């Protein structure tokens, strides 16, 4: 949300609106990110942007929802590539989200030993910078410079092209890396198993979600998705161990 607010402030847009959209649009993220989203979409229609809207409309405040403006809700729903936000603040959030993903995923890959700075093509480093932070700063400044006094939020052709090449590089060398892919497959399996368990054993759901089953006409599968989508990575692993991994026998 900080990147979105920084860009919105520099462009003299509504900073609070940009931050509200940025904070709200991640509420529907599942444990293990896109792997968790894929797992829930495999077993039940699930989209994290739609889930984010569901959280603020139907789940918060004991099911009463939040009284958000149309502009915030529009930005939350349309922050993905397929959507088109109707405000400049929504467009700022959508673009800054892409920049944040590149920054964090590359930083994680370098820290995890999957990549080194030297692996990144020299021409991309020449344009964007020689560190994760430098690349993020380059892209943020480029967005601000090229969007100032414009009717759309965009980057310069050179930096935009470099960013897309960097994302392509990340897909080929990180997201499709056998080590990362193996961990993703484990996460998909685990979330799928949890979903099946809770659908069969709704008594294991927390009271808030059991009450939702009785008091609303939402499908059982939707309520289970609501619960799982709100888990952290570590909590999902904990519940998986609780239900599927036998404890050591005390003899």
Language model regions located:
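A generic, well-ordered mixed alpha/beta core segment in the N-terminal half of proteins
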Residues: 21, 26-62
